[in-house]
């Protein structure tokens, strides 16, 4: 599976439940969010803008994913919103890995270029180094409508946070055959 095939399988609305362990504080917290994922074509203005931000030829981009989220964490009960464009630039010698350009980072809210690897098991692993932190995030499908995500963030050479997230795809509200039969009998 290519990174764009992974993004295409991820397209849609997701309900997310996250548990984060803040190792320095010896504390864990839960969080919930809604996430919307859409694929973007290589010619999309957002893709071109991110490529230009990193001085990468936009013709090297194979597309992108736009991820938008809205959620809250138990620790501070603040609402978290965000919107990020992820632009993969495959390695010409091995398209299963490459650069991942982001207009906003995960651990630090700045534009960042990291790397990605598509595993033979279909999992996407993202590696990102920031000025003060580095993160590793692995995302995989347990089923077509269930994604799992595990991540670690290191600060100053030591682990500072580990997270696990389950993401369930929100399906359309079409009536099931059983409820349709029950509804027709009540008429």
From Swiss-Prot:
**What are the annotated disulfide bridges?**
none
What keywords would UniProt list here?
Answer: Lyase
Checking Pfam families in the record gives: CpeS
Q: Which GO terms describe its molecular function?
A: lyase activity
Q: List its EC numbers.
A: 4.-.-.-
HAMAP family reported in the protein's UniProt record? Chrphore_lyase_CpxS
The record describes the protein's role as: Covalently attaches a chromophore to Cys residue(s) of phycobiliproteins.
Q: What protein family does this chain belong to?
A: Belongs to the CpcS/CpeS biliprotein lyase family.
Q: What is the protein name stated in its UniProt record? A: Chromophore lyase CpcS/CpeS 2
Source species of the chain: Synechococcus sp. (strain JA-3-3Ab) (Cyanobacteria bacterium Yellowstone A-Prime)
